[in-house]
Amino acid sequence: MLEISARLEEALNRAFIKVFPQEDRSSKTSSILTGSNLVPASKPEFGDFQINCALSLAKEIKQPPREIAQKIANQLQKDNDFVRMCNPPRIAGPGFINLSINSKTLISEIHVRLNDKRLGVPLKKFSTDKIEEGKSNNRVILDFSSPNIAKEMHVGHLRSTIIGDSLARILEFRGYEVLRLNHVGDWGTQFGMLITHLKEVVPEVLHTKDVVEISDLVNFYRQAKKRFDEDQIFQNKSRSEVVNLQAGDKESLIAWQLLCNQSRKEFQKIYDRLDIKLTERGESFYNKFLVDVINDLKNKKLLINDQGAQCIFLDGLVGKNGKPQPIIIQKSDGGFNYATTDLAAIKYRLTIPPHGDGACRLIYVTDAGQASHFSGVFQIAKLANWIPTDCQIEHVPFGLVQGEDGKKLKTRSGETIRLVDLLDEAIQRAKNDLKNRLNTERRSENENFIDKVSTTVGIASIKYADLSQNRISNYQFSFDKMLSLQGNTAPYLLYALVRIAGISRKGGDLNVSSHNIQFNESQEWELIRKLLQLDYIIAEVEKELLPNRLCGYLFELSQTFNRFYDQVPILKASEPSRASRLILCSITADTLKLGMSLLGIPTLERM
């Protein structure tokens, strides 16, 4: 109801001008009247919107709040556009004004959605004021997933990957130009260590494709790390290898590239299963910019030499000992670290093309444990004046994935769970559930159907279980809960869609014009009002970057539809009620499909 809300805001502002003339307003009164005074109703029985400013105004202008509310309501009743949209305002409690959209307007909105693939969700309008040439107000960079080369993706990568993907989809749908970046860990001391170890143990890995699996690389990495920690000679060799790599030694670069490619292939298998689209741009991409970052910070007198290291001390940043804690930008041996690379990335991403990406909004999706790191890096970028006033840069943190015991999710042996194993188990459990249900229902389906449904349900359940949680919180992972057909789960939503698809197949083609759509039952109006909330919810997710708000809406919509389905005849109703109710079924299905696609969740016609 974004458009209706905007028109009501305009009508309300016109009423304010009449009831509270500009010349009679105090600064406090003006502040109240120019605030956000129209809000969605807190409960369905209060209507669609509420105006709550009378109580605040009462203290300022010394009048009873109900009297103020009545004056505003009376003036709204004189506004032609308001009267066309709304039933007469109702005063409630100490001075709340409750507004209900009239049936004619609701039916008109439903009819518009019949022919609108966007289902009433407008494209965002972007200002072009004060934008440098080459920049765009709608260009967003989403940094998410970001696994490390030579390591397998684990359950910890799941949240960043699917939260980042869903936010990218929602922002793209709203009209943003989104660059999805995979900032993989493809550089650093660990490569010198790994290459040195592989040269001695399995040298063929470093010049031949596909000799080892990613799981083998992980084991080799563990062996190399153990040697690095215990053997000074090996440690020195590893550091020399890093120097060779940084200097562009041909043999070292070939070995490094083979390791990256092998990992990249394994990552892509996961991304394909999850339907994730990403542009890889690893840490190594920014190597050529690191010296410029140091020089720029030096020229701006932000760096302090601390025992040979180049550091920045930020206000309020102290260590456990209570002393100021430095952020090291360049180590005493001349090397760089994560902070340096992240600063180079910020600078490049905000610089106009062809020397950068020209983005106006940067979003980093990582675990909450990195909040302090990003806070420091963002502060340094601001001090260096790399972030224009019209640009946003934000960290989107998320909590841990826990087991049902409330502890960090691990295997029985205490190992971190591989993401591929998690997906495989979800699909296998979904397949077992499906086969049991088919046996109970005495249904016969071929293996292709069983494989497709179990894969879709398994992947959808994993994604939805995560996205339906407030990302800021830790959440407890449970296969039983996420695969259940009851509650706020992917199978519940998928089943609602399958149910609607069955009704639509029996209902036949729809051919209904606006003048003969007719609704009479309370369940119909409840469903209509819920359907018309989609645009508001998506705008809210765009602003707050909380995908669980969309999940909550889709669950409530499914519940509302199921009540409508259970309590109101559809296929057996007489015309025009039959066609009108089939229209509601169709728009509900379209809304669920759109919402789930924005979450990156696949759907089914049959289960």
From Swiss-Prot:
Monomer. Its EC number is 6.1.1.19. GO terms for cellular component: cytoplasm. Its main location: cytoplasm. It catalyses: tRNA(Arg) + L-arginine + ATP = L-arginyl-tRNA(Arg) + AMP + diphosphate. PANTHER family: ARGININE--TRNA LIGASE, CYTOPLASMIC (PTHR11956:SF5), ARGINYL-TRNA SYNTHETASE (PTHR11956). A motif ('HIGH' region) lies at residues 147-157. It is found in: Cytoplasm. It holds the Pfam family DALR_1. The keyword Protein biosynthesis applies. It comes from the Bacteria. The gene is argS. This is Arginine--tRNA ligase. One of its GO terms (molecular function) is arginine-tRNA ligase activity. Keywords: Aminoacyl-tRNA synthetase, ATP-binding, Cytoplasm, Ligase, Nucleotide-binding, Protein biosynthesis. SUPFAM superfamilies: Anticodon-binding domain of a subclass of class I aminoacyl-tRNA synthetases, Arginyl-tRNA synthetase (ArgRS), N-terminal 'additional' domain, Nucleotidylyl transferase. NCBIfam families: argS (TIGR00456). Gene3D superfamilies: Arginyl tRNA synthetase N-terminal domain, HUPs, Isoleucyl-tRNA Synthetase, Domain 1. Belongs to the class-I aminoacyl-tRNA synthetase family. GO terms for biological process: arginyl-tRNA aminoacylation. Coiled coil: none annotated. SMART domains: Arg_tRNA_synt_N (SM01016), DALR_1 (SM00836). The keyword ATP-binding applies. PROSITE patterns: AA_TRNA_LIGASE_I.
